[in-house]
Each structure stands twice: as structure tokens, then as C-alpha cells.
């Protein structure tokens, strides 16, 4: 036989050429065909001609004879998404289980319970010698779990208290973090110099690095604890704002000291570069966040025709700001916070109400799941072999964290109180110092330490875990009874009324004017300047014009315009002194409304007057608001009954000689036995069947309000006497249908020309005293009569003249 190579290829050209052409026609498989055909040449070995069955398409394996399996298991194919789904499901079920027993979350914070669940799972994983899931890496924490929590906190942060206390928050976050980092680091370095403790190999820079990461007040732990105790808004915004900005400062100091530890020699230029980097990282993150927030607002200006993607822009631009800042080694926390606060101001006015609800609840869901996973992963990662115990280092670390935190708060507050209008009390300072909870930030940072540079990394991990567990468990559990014992001012859950908001804005303008007159540039002055700049430039650029108004506002506007035109026609709007002769007073006529106009008015009122108002309540972090339709319906029912009682009471106390300018009667409700149009009658029957109406039919039939415009005070005396006799008071006693005793029933009301009934022009009211009514209520047979019912009738235009004429002596 000839050797493999040219001779063999010349011997059998037709099948190979046909196969090559066939595979090349098939597309990308041509390259694979050439590789398979040239493989024997490259190896220099003899081989038999390739059969079509031996050529394998890309992405498949060689043909093997096998049978079709009935059941297969391929866990590695879905391992990562399957485990992530199970972790999220476990975290959600754990939260449901905690809240089944209502007293448990009030005694023990939810974060403590989740850490305990994580410790239990970590012990199980460690016992079966399994590795931790891939989701527990520190990169996953900083890139996927932390951004939703910071986004939720920044988007729904109360902006006015934050900016009013911005100086104090920055004072605590920047100066306080430097105070704690340097104080803890230097103190631990002094402890390490004692040879008896065996810590002499830890340098000053390593202690400063550990002090910077252990001084990070975690916003996740602070939110989990302080939202349950409901402290006042100022105290909450100080602690939360400090924890939010404190993390950004901590990360900058951490990277700075970490770079110094990796350098062999540190020069003076490196120190100044580190200080400059401190400001560049913070300010750069804020600028990136504001810029992308403006872009998000400008984008949502053009989404009125496609509302579905509006919530998507909020999450995309906010997360883009975070990862962009991290890409340039800037502060991602500052970037996403600034972006969220900017979007909350402008994006909310461009998106629809449904999109806003979607944003709110989806953001709440993401933050809640991320927070739950963080605490569970902290418990799981605690159990392992990466620990080194040293009593001196661990105990002194915990003591120095508490001491330097308390000293920093009291010293810095004493300085900042000189510049505050409302100084912080001793109780507030104590709660701020007590609320310095450590959490996932320092836990993740200590795991990021390179083991080659830090040989005592396991000791740092152990000390950080002890500090985290002490602050979360001991301080977190005892802070609620401590707040109650000190009687710290709590938050007011009452929603601000419209009048209160108007008065607050009025006082803001007054204080701004006073500051302008005095030449003092306070926060009121700068807020007013920014508002003018915002109205003049930013809102015109970022907010869509011709914002749609709600139906109730449009209806109210139409009714007000119609009422103003009517008042102008009747002359009631004139309040300036008149120089016309008082004797020359003529009765003004009002154009009667056509039946079609009356039907239209009644239809508008019946459709829109008593609709339940839909309100968006204030944001609560983890608890969904209950359905308020029943409560709003009860509120409307109470207000309607109260207004009806007040109107009857006021009309009873009116002067009998009230003047009337016209004889036209306008009814708020229809007179008794008046037939409705078919459209309104069907709607009324449907509403009564559904139970929407809260007033009984009997009351609606007997209670008729006569709405007549008030006349001028200079009407002639004869006309006022004539109008004052339009009402009379008398009894109307109603007895049971079965008894034939009692007073005779009143005569039937005469029919009008239109076919409806006219109510008599008599106002029936009880005139007897309480004792006399009790005596008359007994009949001859001893059966008590039913109490008289108050019936109020209004006069009809057709019967007024005849009744007034019959009453004359």
C-alpha cells in the first residue's frame, strides 16, 4: 500500500471532493471539512478514506450507539441559576416566617434573625464539607447586592431634611470617619507594641487600614434597625445620611491605605496625591450621578407614547451611574445616591402613575431581597476555617470602636451646635453614638484584603465579625427599649394637610425675605435661588410640557368657571361700594336651565361627585400599604352625613327674615317622587345594587335643599316681608302602617305641568318641647306613638304665590 499523502488523495478523489463541496455549500461547516480532510496529512500517518458517517457537524459528538433515556439529570447545566433561585426563595420564606409571630420582629431586629439563619446554613454547609456558593463572593456583594439598597435609600430619601442638615451630615461623615479611623488605628498599633500579646508583626499602616474599614457605619444595618423604632425625622436623617456618605469615605480611605501598604517606600508626593484622590473620588461620583440623572429625566420626557419602558430607564441609568463610577475608581455609592435623588425630582413628573407604582414596588422588592441575602450570606460566610483568635486584639478592637465612636459624636456635635439653629440635645447625641452599627461593608472589605500583603488577615476577619455581631445583636436589640426609656421624640405618621403645607411654604417665603433684608445668606436664601433657576431652566428642559391633569381637577375647574359666570350674571360678585340709588332696585332674572342642561349636570355630578379619591401614600420600606378603598368610602360617608347635619342645623338657626333675590329654586337633590331619566335611573339602580351609595332612599326623598343665591342687603322692605313668609314650621308624625291611629296623612301634592309632583312650600320642624312630646306619644290604648321624624321641605316656584296669598290676614 502506498503511504498516506498525495498518492492516497489521488486514488480516491471523487468522494472526498463531493463531500468537501457539500459541506462548503452548507455554510460555516466548510472550514471544519477542510480541517478533517487535512488532518491525516498533518499527522503524517496513514488513514482510510473518510466516510460521510465519520464527519461530525459542529456542536455535536461522534455518533455512538445508545438508547433513548427515559429520565436524565444534568445538574451542572443549571447549577448557578438554580442555587441563586433557591437562596432567594429561602430568604423570602425566612422573612415570612419571622412575621408570622408578630411580637418577634419588635423584640429582635430582622437582621439578627437573618444572620442566625445564615449561621445555621453555614454550619450545615461546613459539616458536609461543601464550598460556599459562588454568590457569596465580595465582588457579587459590591456589584449586585449593594446597589439596589443604596438606590432605594437615595430615591425615597426626604430631600428637604437631608439638605437642611447637609452640613451636619458631611461633618459626621468626613471628619467623623477620619476621627474614628485614625483613633482606632493608632490605638491598636499601641496595643500591638506590647510583646505579651504576640501582635508585634502588625505595622502601623495595617492597623490604620483595619481602622478605616472597621469604622464604616453600614446603611443596611442602620435601615434595618432605625425604621422599626420610628425615631424623629431629623435624628433618622442624620444617622442614615452619615452611614450613607460614611461608606464612600471609608472605601476611599481603604483604597488609600491599601495602596500605601503595597508600596515599599512612601514619599511626600504620595500623601498629597492620596488627599487629592480623596476629594476627586467623592466629587467625581456625585457629578457622574447628577449627569446621568439629568439624562434619565430628559429621556423620560419623550416616553408618553410608550409607557411600558418608563420604569426600565430608572433602573438602567441608576445602575449605569454606579458601574461607571466604579470603572473610573470613583465612589459608586455617591454616584447612585446623587442619580437617585435627581431622578426622584424630575422623572416622577414625566412618568405615569402606574409607572411610578411599578418603580416604587419593584425597587422595594430588590432592596428587600438584597438586604436579606446580605445578612444570610454574612452568617454563612462566618462559619469556616478562615479565623484566628487573639483575645487582646479582638477585645481591644471592640472597646476602641465604642469609645472612639462616642467621643467623636460628642466632640463633633459640640462644635457643630454653634452653627445650628436647632442644636442637637444630649439624647440625640447618645442615640447617634449608639446607632453606629457595623455591617456588610466592613465584612466585605476585610475579605478583600490580599493575603500576601496581610499575613494576619484571618485575625482581622475574626475581629471584624465580632464587632459586627456585637453591634447588630447587642446594640440593635437594646436600642428600642433605650429610645423608649429616654423618651426620644418619635416620628409623626400623620400626613400633612393642604393648609399646613400652604402655611409652611408661606413661612419659607417670609424667612427668605427676612434673610434677604438682613443680608444673611442662609439655606432659605439658597433654596429660593435654586428654585428660581430650576423653574427658569431645568424644568423647561427636563419635564414634559402640557402635563395631563386628573379628571377631578378638570371637573372642579369647569364647575368653578361656571359658578363664577353665574355669579357675575346675578351681580353677586360685586363687593365694591355702589353709587346707584338704593331705591332703584329691580329684581334680576336668571336664565332657566333647559332640561337637557339639567340632565347633563346631574349626570356629571352622579358620575364624579362622590368618587373615591385615589391617593399615593407615603413610602414605607418593607410593609405594603393596605387597601384603603374601604377606609376612604367610610370617610366620604362620614363627611356627607356631617355636611348634611351641618346644613340642616345652620338653616334652622337662620333668621326668619332672610331675603331672597329670585324665586327660582335649584336643588342639590331631586324632589320626592320626581321621575329620573332612563339613563340616570339605570345608573342609580346599579349603584344601589352594588352598595356604593351610603344614603338611604327615604332620606334622599324627603331631604331637599333649596339653594337660592343670597340677595343684597339693600332690598326693599315689602319684598323681604313677602319672601320671609315662604316657610312654616309644623309637626309631621308618622305611625306604623298597621295602626289606624295617629294624625291624618297630609293631602297629596298637586301635579305640575310636566307631570311631576310639587312639594308643598312648608318647612316642617318639631316645635314641641321634650316633655310635651313625651306626653303626646302615648295613645289611649297605652301603645307609644313613634317619635316624630324631621322632614324638611323646600318651596316650589309654582306654589309660592298661592301659599303666600293664602297666608295673608
Swiss-Prot record:
Catalysed reaction, written as an equation: Na(+)(in) + H(+)(out) = Na(+)(out) + H(+)(in)
Compartment list: Apical cell membrane
Record bears the keyword Translocase: no
Composition-biased stretches (Basic and acidic residues): 648-660, 793-809
Residues that carry a glycan: 350
UniProt keyword annotation of Transmembrane helix present: yes
Region (Disordered): 648-700, 734-809
Any single GO CC term annotated in Swiss-Prot or TrEMBL for this entry: apical plasma membrane
Function per UniProt: Plasma membrane Na(+)/H(+) antiporter. Mediates the electroneutral exchange of intracellular H(+) ions for extracellular Na(+). Major apical Na(+)/H(+) exchanger in the base of the colonic crypt. Controls in the colonic crypt intracellular pH (pHi) to direct colonic epithelial cell differentiation into the absorptive enterocyte lineage at the expense of the secretory lineage.
PANTHER family, A to Z: SODIUM/HYDROGEN EXCHANGER, SODIUM_HYDROGEN EXCHANGER 2
Protein name: Sodium/hydrogen exchanger 2
Amino acid at each position: 500500500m502506498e503511504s498516506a499523502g498525495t498518492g492516497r488523495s489521488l486514488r480516491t478523489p471523487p468522494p472526498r471532493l463531493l463531500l468537501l463541496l457539500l459541506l462548503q455549500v452548507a455554510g460555516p461547516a466548510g472550514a471544519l471539512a477542510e480541517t478533517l480532510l487535512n488532518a491525516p496529512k498533518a499527522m503524517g500517518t496513514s488513514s482510510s478514506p473518510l466516510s460521510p458517517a465519520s464527519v461530525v457537524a459542529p456542536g455535536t459528538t461522534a455518533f455512538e450507539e445508545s438508547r433513548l433515556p427515559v429520565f436524565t439529570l444534568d445538574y451542572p447545566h443549571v447549577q448557578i441559576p438554580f442555587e441563586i433561585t433557591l437562596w432567594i426563595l429561602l430568604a423570602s420564606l425566612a422573612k415570612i416566617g419571622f412575621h408570622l409571630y408578630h411580637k418577634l420582629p419588635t423584640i429582635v431586629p430582622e437582621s439578627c434573625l437573618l444572620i442566625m439563619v445564615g449561621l445555621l446554613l453555614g454550619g450545615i454547609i461546613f459539616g458536609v464539607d461543601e464550598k460556599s456558593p459562588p454568590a457569596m463572593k465580595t465582588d457579587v456583594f459590591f456589584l449586585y447586592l449593594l446597589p439596589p439598597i443604596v438606590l432605594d435609600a437615595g430615591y425615597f430619601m426626604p430631600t428637604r431634611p437631608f439638605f437642611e442638615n447637609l452640613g451636619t451630615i458631611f461633618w459626621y461623615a468626613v471628619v467623623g470617619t477620619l476621627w474614628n479611623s485614625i483613633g482606632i488605628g493608632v490605638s491598636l498599633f499601641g496595643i500591638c507594641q506590647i510583646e505579651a500579646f504576640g501582635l508585634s508583626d502588625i505595622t502601623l499602616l495595617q492597623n490604620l487600614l483595619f481602622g478605616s474599614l472597621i469604622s464604616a457605619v453600614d446603611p443596611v444595618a442602620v435601615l434595618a434597625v432605625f425604621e422599626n423604632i420610628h425615631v424623629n425625622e431629623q435624628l433618622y436623617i442624620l444617622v442614615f445620611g452619615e452611614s450613607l456618605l460614611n461608606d464612600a469615605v471609608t472605601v476611599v480611605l481603604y483604597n488609600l491605605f491599601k495602596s500605601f501598604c503595597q508600596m515599599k517606600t512612601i514619599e511626600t508626593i504620595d500623601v498629597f496625591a492620596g488627599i487629592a484622590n480623596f476629594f476627586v473620588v467623592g466629587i467625581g461620583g456625585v457629578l457622574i450621578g447628577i449627569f446621568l440623572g439629568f439624562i434619565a429625566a430628559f429621556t423620560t420626557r419623550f416616553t408618553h407614547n410608550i409607557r411600558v419602558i418608563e420604569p426600565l430607564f430608572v433602573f438602567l441609568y441608576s445602575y449605569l451611574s454606579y458601574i461607571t463610577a466604579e470603572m473610573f475608581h470613583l465612589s459608586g455609592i455617591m454616584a447612585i445616591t446623587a442619580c437617585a435623588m435627581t431622578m426622584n425630582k424630575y422623572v416622577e413628573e414625566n412618568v405615569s402613575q402606574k409607572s411610578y407604582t411599578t418603580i416604587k414596588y419593584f425597587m422595594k422588592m430588590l432592596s428587600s431581597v438584597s438586604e436579606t441575602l446580605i445578612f444570610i450570606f454574612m452568617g454563612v460566610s462566618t462559619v469556616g476555617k478562615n479565623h484566628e483568635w487573639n483575645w487582646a486584639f479582638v477585645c481591644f478592637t471592640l472597646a476602641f470602636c465604642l469609645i472612639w465612636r462616642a467621643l467623636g459624636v460628642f466632640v463633633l456635635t459640640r462644635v457643630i451646635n454653634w452653627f445650628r439653629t436647632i442644636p442637637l440635645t444630649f439624647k440625640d447625641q447618645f442615640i447617634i453614638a449608639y446607632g453606629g452599627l457595623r455591617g456588610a461593608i466592613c465584612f466585605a472589605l476585610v475579605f478583600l484584603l490580599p493575603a500576601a500583603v496581610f499575613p494576619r488577615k484571618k485575625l482581622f476577619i475574626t475581629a471584624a465579625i465580632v464587632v459586627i455581631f456585637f453591634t447588630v445583636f447587642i446594640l440593635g436589640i437594646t436600642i428600642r427599649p433605650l429610645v423608649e426609656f429616654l423618651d426620644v421624640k418619635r416620628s409623626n405618621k400623620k400626613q400633612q394637610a393642604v393648609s399646613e403645607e400652604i402655611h409652611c411654604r408661606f413661612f419659607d417665603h417670609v424667612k427668605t425675605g427676612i434673610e434677604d433684608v438682613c443680608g444673611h445668606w442662609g439655606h432659605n436664601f439658597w433654596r429660593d435661588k435654586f428654585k428660581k433657576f430650576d423653574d427658569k431652566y431645568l424644568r423647561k428642559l427636563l419635564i414634559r410640557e402640557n402635563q395631563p391633569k386628573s379628571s377631578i381637577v378638570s371637573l372642579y375647574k369647569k364647575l368653578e368657571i361656571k359658578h363664577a359666570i353665574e355669579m357675575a350674571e346675578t351681580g353677586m360678585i360685586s363687593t365694591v361700594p355702589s353709587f346707584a340709588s338704593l331705591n332703584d332696585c329691580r329684581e334680576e332674572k336668571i336664565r332657566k336651565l333647559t332640561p337637557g342642561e339639567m340632565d347633563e349636570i346631574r349626570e356629571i355630578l352622579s358620575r364624579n361627585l362622590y368618587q373615591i379619591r385615589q391617593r399615593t401614600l407615603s413610602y414605607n420600606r418593607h410593609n405594603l400599604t393596605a387597601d384603603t378603598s374601604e377606609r376612604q368610602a367610610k370617610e366620604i360617608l362620614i363627611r356627607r352625613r356631617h355636611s348634611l347635619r351641618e346644613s340642616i342645623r345652620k338653616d334652622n338657626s337662620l333668621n326668619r327674615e332672610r331675603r331672597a333675590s329670585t324665586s327660582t329654586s335649584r336643588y342639590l337633590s331631586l324632589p320626592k317622587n320626581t321621575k329620573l331619566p332612563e339613563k340616570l335611573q339605570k345608573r342609580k339602580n346599579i349603584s344601589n345594587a352594588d352598595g356604593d351609595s351610603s344614603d338611604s332612599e327615604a332620606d334622599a326623598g324627603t331631604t331637599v335643599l333649596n339653594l337660592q343665591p343670597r340677595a343684597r342687603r339693600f332690598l326693599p322692605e315689602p319684598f323681604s316681608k313677602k319672601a320671609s313668609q315662604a316657610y312654616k314650621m309644623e309637626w309631621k308624625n308618622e305611625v306604623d302602617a298597621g295602626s289606624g291611629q295617629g294624625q291624618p296623612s297630609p293631602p297629596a301634592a298637586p301635579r305640575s305641568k310636566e307631570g311631576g309632583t310639587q312639594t308643598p312650600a312648608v318647612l316642617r320642624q318639631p316645635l314641641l318641647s321634650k316633655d310635651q312630646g313625651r306626653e303626646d306619644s302615648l295613645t289611649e290604648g297605652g301603645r307609644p306613638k313613634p317619635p316624630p321624624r324631621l322632614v324638611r321641605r323646600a318651596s316650589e316656584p309654582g306654589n309660592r304665590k298661592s301659599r303666600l296669598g293664602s297666608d295673608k290676614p
